Amino acid sequence: QECKCHGVSGSCTTKTCWNTLPKFREIGFVLKEKYNDAVHVEVVRANRLRQPTFLKIKKVRSYQKPMETDLVYIERSPNYCEEDSTTGSVGTQGRLCNRTSPHTDGCDLMCCGRGYNTHQYTKVWQCNCKFHWCC
């Protein structure tokens, strides 16, 4: 929820509030965590016509069954490291990576164990620095 105050000279004589959605980055972070913790399930067909089809945990990593808010999957994700025209994945080979980053832009993760070549770049830019004589 966000609020805004209205009034003379910044006073808050009237306050207007409204509901807002979470930031896109926050939603993405939660979805990525759910993706990382997703549970593999398999479809179990009923033997009788009156029984419904349901999902069963494929590999038991704990004795707890997934909650309604957990992410489950039936098929494994494609290998994003390799090019795959059927899924539209262009792979990660030849992309620039950050050698010191532990995140998805880091070479250890992006290069998928293939190794990588390092290049040193020098960037020159206007810094708008000012010199102040102090003493």
From Swiss-Prot:
O-palmitoleoyl serine-type lipidated residues: 9
Membrane spanning stretches: none
Keyword field contains rRNA-binding: no
GO cellular component, one term: extracellular space
Main location: secreted
Positions annotated as glycosylated: 98
Gene Ontology biological process: animal organ development; canonical Wnt signaling pathway; cell fate commitment; neuron differentiation; positive regulation of JNK cascade; tissue development
UniProt-recorded Gene Ontology molecular function terms: cytokine activity; frizzled binding
Subcellular location, record wording: Secreted, Extracellular space, Extracellular matrix; Secreted
Record has Cell wall biogenesis/degradation as a keyword: no
PTM description: Palmitoleoylation is required for efficient binding to frizzled receptors. Depalmitoleoylation leads to Wnt signaling pathway inhibition.
Pfam families linked to this entry: wnt
Stretches the record annotates as Disordered linker: 41-69
Annotated disulfide bonds: 3-17, 5-12, 81-112, 97-107, 134-135
Organs and tissues of expression: In adults, in brain and lung.
Highest taxon, organism lineage: Eukaryota
Keywords linked to the UniProt accession: Developmental protein, Disulfide bond, Extracellular matrix, Glycoprotein, Lipoprotein, Secreted, Wnt signaling pathway
Family affiliation: Belongs to the Wnt family.
Job description of the protein: Ligand for members of the frizzled family of seven transmembrane receptors that functions in the canonical Wnt/beta-catenin signaling pathway. Required for normal fusion of the chorion and the allantois during placenta development. Required for central nervous system (CNS) angiogenesis and blood-brain barrier regulation.
UniProt protein name: Protein Wnt-7b
Organism of provenance: Xenopus laevis
Gene from which the chain derives: wnt7b
